[in-house]
């Protein structure tokens, strides 16, 4: 199986109802979950000219899953709790990871 990184992007949200749904989603995808990942906070942007910015993109976390192809990952992610607000502000970006 191939491995894929899920990047969670959207406005920062305090722990709440959607966060409580994550364990159920992790259980639902079962063996497809390779790395539960981690939330991200307090980022910094370092540019090639040496300048910095303490306002990085709205990247909130990541997970790693395994599947036969990206279409299977899309099916796994369609009901992810991070997308539950359903207003388009939240997204999960999917990237295939090369074999090591």
Give the residues covered by each predicted segment.
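Conserved, structured core segments of small domains
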Residues: 1-100
